[in-house]
């Protein structure tokens, strides 16, 4: 009995649901959705972000993104950037975001499921050139991510003090959640691949990674803090590190 909406690059800002227009605005207001919803992605959804390099003095607001509802802040002299992210907040009705066919791509943007989202499924999507996180979850529960591909990210406006976002931030960062499964995903040359626990004091519960392929990845495969983690049948090929368990993980 789920509602279903289809999204293409041409309709990303015009699709309507629940009195909202544009896929960014629909999911940003997911707390207003009370029944199961399936969002079906067809083809490549592109922000069309320009590729010019930024610097530490760059201050660009509004005009970086081409999907309504995404974050668009790049702050000069700040410690961090946060743009081209879709913050999906408070979804409790049951949400699925899935690609249709073998060419469903999220290009130059990503998702963060936060503020007590629950019963979320993300499947059959390819994430590429994301400047921040590709598909992350914070303070949420019952999150199932499977059959997705994560290619290397790209952030040409990296103004962080560490200058470590050139390849994007995390592919699948999971912080402060419970009951998370990541399965049958492929990671290609990702840098800060998967962080579980943003600090030594944030606790997470019941994470499982299984049947994932880490192909030439650099780090955080995953990096875990304060979480009980079950990993099995994952394959690592030419990676910089492997599992990095810290802080009572």
Residue ranges and their predicted role:
Residues 93-103, 118-129, 141-156, 160-161, ...:
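Right-handed parallel beta-helix
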Residues 18-35, 50-96, 105-123, 128-141:
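Extracellular beta-strand-rich solenoid/capping regions of secreted or surface-exposed proteins
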Residues 41-43, 96:
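Acidic, glycine-rich low-complexity segments
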Residues 11, 44-47, 102-103:
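Acidic glycine-/aspartate-rich tracts in secreted/extracellular proteins
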Residues 1-20:
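Right-handed parallel beta-helix/beta-solenoid
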Residues 1-5, 71, 249:
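Long, ordered, amphipathic alpha-helical scaffolds
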């Amino acid at each position: 009995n789920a509602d279903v909406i289809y999204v293409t690059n041409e309709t990303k800002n015009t699709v309507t649901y629940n009195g909202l227009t544009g896929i960014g605005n629909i999911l940003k207001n997911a707390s207003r959705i009370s029944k199961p919803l399936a969002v079906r992605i067809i083809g490549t959804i592109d922000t069309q972000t320009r590729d010019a390099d930024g610097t530490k003095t760059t201050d660009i607001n509004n005009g970086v993104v081409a999907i309504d509802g995404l974050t668009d802040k790049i702050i000069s002299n700040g410690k961090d950037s946060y743009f081209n992210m879709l913050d999906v907040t408070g979804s409790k009705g049951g949400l699925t975001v899935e690609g249709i066919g073998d060419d469903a791509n999220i290009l130059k943007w990503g998702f963060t499921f936060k503020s007590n989202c629950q019963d979320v499924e993300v499947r059959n999507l390819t994430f590429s050139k994301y400047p921040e996180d590709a598909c992350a979850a914070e303070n949420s529960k019952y999150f199932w991510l499977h059959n997705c591909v994560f290619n290397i990210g790209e952030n040409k406006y990296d103004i962080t003090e560490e200058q470590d976002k050139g390849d994007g931030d995390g592919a699948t960062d999971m912080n402060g959640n419970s009951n998370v499964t990541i399965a049958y995903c492929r990671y290609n040359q990702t840098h800060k691949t998967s962080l579980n626990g943003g600090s030594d004091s944030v606790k997470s519960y019941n994470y499982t990674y299984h049947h994932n392929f880490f192909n030439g990845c650099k780090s955080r495969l995953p990096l875990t803090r304060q979480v009980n983690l079950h990993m099995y049948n994952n394959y690592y090929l030419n990676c910089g590190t492997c599992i990095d368990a810290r802080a009572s993980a």
